[in-house]
Amino acid sequence: MNIKKLILPAAAALGGVVIPVLIYMFFNYGKPELIKGWAIPIATDTAFVLGILSFFSRHISLELRAFIIGFSLIDDAFALIILALFYAKTINTLALLISSIIIFILFILNYRQVKQLFYYIIVGLLLCISMVKSGIHDTLCRAIIALFIPVNIKGEFNTSFKKLENLIRPFVNYFILPLFVFMNSGILLEYFAFKGICSNSILALIYGIIFGLSVGKQLGIMLFSYPFVKFKLCNLPSDTSWLKFYSIAILRGIGFTLSLFIGSNV
């Protein structure tokens, strides 16, 4: 693994977590009932970012696409780990220990290059059960399983799967995702009565989330990425200017459904 290529997405993801949290806390400082929602603006909705980028696929190099996916994985991992560590109601130590053992088994399967999906499905189901019993949200479990499933499975199944993926991708990007947003936003319109929306608490919450995502994400990504590139600890993706990199940073502020998901678990 090329460590230099890992540094940039890791630094960008860290900045995309730290600065939004600080901005949210700035607006909600001194409000105990709202400050606990500090994790809401840290998450990026990767599916929507990739959907938007599909319109500009000709202008995105393979290296930049790899950076975006790498950033997304690390960013989502931060969000899920924070959710698991800070928002779990109760922790069952024994179940957590069993989960750790099962994760190690997944690692062994991947390390030994076991390509039969059947084993990953069985072990993954056991991991989901143990993780739910431990008190940690099962979303983290699915992310862990996906991390260990090999991507280089060869044969007829893989070829058919790729064809199906290419067939349904436009339908998912341009129809399913917008419909999903509309149907799952969880926003009650009566909350937008004039008196309610103008209360100090609601405004602080709204400002914290909106500025955390729209300003904090891009600011954090740029502030944490620039020094590493400047001191040659890593490089920008090929055929990528700082302006293009900044445009990607702006898109990382799309945190709709994942932010709602975290908010519902706060």
Curated annotation (Swiss-Prot):
Is the Transmembrane helix keyword given for this protein?
A: yes
- Pfam families on file: Na_H_antiport_1
Q: Which GO terms describe its molecular function?
A: sodium:proton antiporter activity
> What's an example GO cellular component term for this entry?
plasma membrane
Transmembrane helix among the record's keywords? yes
Q: Domain of life, per the record?
A: Bacteria
Q: Which UniProt keywords apply?
A: Cell inner membrane, Cell membrane, Membrane, Transmembrane, Transmembrane helix
Put simply, this protein is called Putative Na(+)/H(+) antiporter NhaA homolog
